[in-house]
Amino acid sequence: MAETRRKVLEVLNGKSLTPPPIWLMRQAGRYLPEYRATRAKAGSFLDLCYTPDLAVEVTLQPIRRYAFDAAILFSDILVIPDALHRNVRFEEGHGPRMDPIDTDGIAGLKADGILSHLSPVFETVARLRRELPEETTLLGFCGAPWTVATYMIAGRGTPDQAPARLFAYRHPKAFEELLAFLADVSADYLVAQIDAGADAVQIFDSWAGVLGEDEFARFAVEPVRRMIASVRARRPSAKIIAFAKGAGLLLKDYRRLTGADAIGLDWAVPLAFAAELQKDGPVQGNLDPMRVVAGGGAMESGIDRILDVLGNGPLIFNLGHGITPEADPENVSALVARVRGTKG
């Protein structure tokens, strides 16, 4: 019997595959009618994340429909602040909300009980690894310390995360303590996901793009480096993707400085620059999600350009950020077919 291949893992090990493996950020999401039906049963969004029966189901839905090469655990980057009792809630039309943290709150943070609070997530991971096709890579994930901290400081998302940037300037010691704490507990969380059955993990730094050069080094690079070093100290073979959205030219040294195996690229990263980054190792991305909403020629030309420029090197095809609720599931079918059929 032929050995089962997990193509995403092969690329994370530096192999170039034609066609490249494909999965999509937020592939389990509101664009799918089956997701909306399951979501309606769940109660709150966090109930969906913490109920293994439901979290397993929504993770598997896009695999059944599209046979993506990877499944990504259905959860949220804000389960860490939820485990820290920050009263996290998701309000319709307003996004995430939580109790803002101050310097006293940072001084009082304790890691006790975080992993037990998140035990339903690990049950979901273990069940997914049993239920997924053998060839499907299972990805775990967490938020990067900077991005999680922005929500903890402001108590919500803001257009440019000015509250966290201001807090970092006014209270530099407390802010760096918060980032170090989040790096350590997030590393513990990723190790637990790997131990439960995740084949690889992704670190999402969705708000890296609001940082200046010096702040990027201190708040985006250093905490992620600390996380990855902590994971690798315990699980040396761990495969890690790091996605610093909006980082632009600061991605040049991001892989080397953080130790990530692969770097995620948003849709604004020029493909010529992406090709330079790919010389150092695998890249993931980077189709504009709006091309999937548009479909047709706009989507096809975007796919073809990425494959033309990056398809001969180690590439995991993905979007440049999460798929949006307006995307037509049929367009996603066409996307997958074109990625798998254009080359080779």
Swiss-Prot record:
Pathway: Porphyrin-containing compound metabolism; protoporphyrin-IX biosynthesis; coproporphyrinogen-III from 5-aminolevulinate: step 4/4. Signal peptide: none annotated. The keyword Plastid does not apply. Its main location: cytoplasm. SUPFAM superfamilies: UROD/MetE-like. It is found in: Cytoplasm. Keywords: Cytoplasm, Decarboxylase, Lyase, Porphyrin biosynthesis. InterPro entries: UROD/MetE-like_sf, Uroporphyrinogen_deCO2ase_HemE, Uroporphyrinogen_deCOase. One of its GO terms (molecular function) is uroporphyrinogen decarboxylase activity. Homodimer. PANTHER family: METHYLTETRAHYDROFOLATE:HOMOCYSTEINE METHYLTRANSFERASE RELATED, UROPORPHYRINOGEN DECARBOXYLASE. This is Uroporphyrinogen decarboxylase.
